[in-house]
Structure formats: C-alpha cells, structure tokens
Amino acid sequence: KFKLRNLERVAITINYTSAPEIPTVHMGSRTTSYIMKGVTNAHSNFAKAFRENHWYNISGIDVYTMSNNMSAIAIIGNSITDGKCSTDNAQNRWPDVMSEMLQLKHKITNQGVLNLGIGNNRVTVPGGFGALAKERFDRDILMQSGVKKVVIFEGVNDIGAARSGSSETVARKIIESIQGMVKKAKARKMKVY
C-alpha cells in the first residue's frame, strides 16, 4: 500500500531468480530501465546499472482509491499515442500532457489517463506491431479497471500500409472496425471520442 499524489511518477523494481528467455518489452516507452545483477531495491546504487530506454514485463498497474468518484480515460493508439517524437524520460507524450492539462488546468483530479498506444499498430492491416487494434480492444481497453471514457486514435498506419488501389477498401475496413469498437464500449456505458 502506497500513498500517491496525482501525477506522481512511480518506479517499479522486479527481481528474478533467472532472466526470462523471452521477456516482454515496450520498445517505444521512451523511459529508461535500469538492469542489474543480484537483488535490487530502492536503496540500490543504480549508477552502475545497464541502461535501456525500454520498459520490460509490466502490463499494467491498478490504482485503488477510497473515492467512489474516480475513473479512467483509456486511449488506444499507434506510435503517435505511444510517444513517437517525445523526449526520453520527460513523460511528455500527448496522453501525459492531456493528463496534466485535465489535472492542473481544468482541475479534473478524479480521472486517470491510460496510454495503450503501440508504435506501428494498425486497426485491420496485418504487419504492424502488436495485435491489431480491433483484436486487442477487449484486452487493452474493456478489461481495464475503472474506464469510463475511451479515445480511439488509430488508422493512419493502415492507410500508409495500404497497397495501391486498395485505399477505399482499407478505409471501409478501418471505419467498420472502429464502429465495432465504439459499439462494444457503448454497451459498457463508456463515452467514446
């Protein structure tokens, strides 16, 4: 149990008895991970650690509160959401800025922002990174705790990957898939943007 303030950054330490053969990785996290041999904790000297600008092994963190009025805005997207062109360790991806604006400028302190962006992700055209947005929507959006609002910010990579002459077909498939995501979210009383 930790007492956290709004917008507070959290560091996570994981100790393994042996390294995973195939670790999960978030290549575009734009946040430094520190990797060391042996048991580590908050008091370890991370100056000697191997540094890598990726996240490993964490699929999510649930934050529990005593308030009944808390909720989350979940954003499904591609590299633009994931943080492409943001600054390493600055936490200035557009969902980070959105969260700060809601909290600091608009005084909306009861909503968290969940960034479910994956670089080069696509809605319907295979070949990008991660599961297609239409396939990961249930897991990445609908199964998140406390989500009341959803932002769908996907499709540009499908358009870019479309073969010549197939743009109308790709556009139709994107629209149909996003409409399916909207229908699922609305069935759970979520507001969709």
Task: Please report, for each region that a protein language model flagged, where it lies by residue.
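N-terminal secretory targeting modules
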Residues: K1-I76, T81-D88
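Solvent-exposed loop/turn segments at secondary-structure junctions
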Residues: S18-A19, S79-G83, I118-T124, V156-G160
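Secondary-structure boundary elements
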Residues: T65-M70, E100-T109
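Structural recognition of the beta-strand scaffold that forms the well-ordered cores
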Residues: A72-G77, T81, Q111-G117, K148-E154, ...
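Alpha-helical cap/lid subdomain in secreted, periplasmic
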Residues: N89, D96, E100, H106, ...
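Short connector loops at secondary-structure junctions
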Residues: H106-V125
